[in-house]
UniProtKB/Swiss-Prot annotation:
It comes from Camponotus floridanus. Pfam families: BRISC_FAM175B_helical (PF22299), MPN_2A_DUB_like (PF21125). Residues 245-272 form a coiled coil. PANTHER family: ABRAXAS FAMILY MEMBER (PTHR31728), OS07G0540200 PROTEIN (PTHR31728:SF5). CDD domains: Abraxas_2_insects (cd23525). This is BRISC complex subunit FAM175B. Residues 359-370 have a biased composition (Low complexity).
Amino acid sequence: MADSDLLVTISGAALSLLFFENVRSVGNQMGFLLGEALEFIVKTYTDSDNQVETVKIHINVEAIVTCPLADLLHDSTNHINKEKLKDFVRDKSKQVIGWFCFRRNTTNLTLTLKDKLLHKQFASHFSGVNGCKEDFFLTCLLNASTSETSGTHKFRHVFLRHNKRGMFEPISLKINNLGDDASRHDGSDYKPTPVRKSTRTPDSFTKLIESLNLDVARIDGLDSAMLIQKAAEHHLMSLIPKVCESDLEVAELEKQVHELKIKIATQQLAKRLKINGENCDRISKASKDNCFSEKIDSSKKNEVRIGDDACLQREHIPSCTQSVGPNNRTVCRNTAACIAKSAEKSRRAGRSNLQESGNQQQETQNFFTNSRRSIPEIATESICQEGSEISMGRGRGSGRGSHEFTPGMKKIRRTPGTSHMHSSRERSTTPPEQDFSDAECPISSPVLRSYSQVTKKTNLDKCNSMAPLDI
């Protein structure tokens, strides 16, 4: 009596590597699972001394190979390219026991029609290479999610196989601890020997034991253990240079990848700057056009306002107003005509201002010329009013004793400051001093002669006193 049991085993390091490679990818990703399928026959005895044989198959996943470009292995119709698949897997085709598919932004771990087609093609291709049955070829679906604070990462996974009934059924997974082995599924110390392996190639430990040719019957167990330890240390020391070379190759590749990333980043930055520069030029050009259009609009508005003001002025002036009926209104104005009218108006205003200023200058000149009188007229002018008692004498000195004032005049207290102020005001407002040296005086009356001489003398003294002040 025999029944079958299928189990998938994987180490913690291999499972962590699988999750890490999927999370660090940008989008969806696929790849292959490397390992071997082990078949065990476990014999048990019942209470009635019946022997029961149980066949257990353990599919041990040891490593993974990721494929960044899924379209590299198959075309748009989901048919795989066997030549490209061989070039991608190379010498690891005998270790392929399944494939995986990682999807982002989804919580559904079910196979699509595309996944089913790819699974059948991969199983038929690799089962003929490594001797593994198509029923034991695995499919692993994975997804990942993070919490709101990005502090917790959640991973979901399921292993499936295609059974004989044509359906995909899930397979239980067991994660091996450091002290466990893939063959000891129950955690016991008893290590069964596999009856059949999917891979015929021996591992490193088997090669090491075979190279020693130990005779267990003749050599003590302690001595054989010491020989195995020394051989293992020698093998590890021989692997150090190979590991160093591989690490150097990896470092060189990482350096090249970093340089390519920097180059791509600089190209993208230059492209962005170029686009931004073009956008800035477009924006500046658009702003200039907008400013120009705004200036044109404002000038048009000003022209319309000038035209409206001119119309209002024409309406207010009776001589220029004309009766305009509702049917005679102008529908639109000519901008050029408005500009010409405003320019002509400004020119006329400037000419009128010039004429007014010229008239004012002419009036001031006439005023000064009219105000210039001869000395006899000044001397014969009466200071007091005619008919008054004090108007007997002629001259400026007579009648000083009178304190009568004409109506409208005010009494001002004379101070040195005010006299100085009046003198400065006289200098600034009065016309230039006249030279009375050549003035003709009539000799008819002695009073007039004496007054003219006094006036002439005082005027000369005044001119002499003002001469040093004019700098």
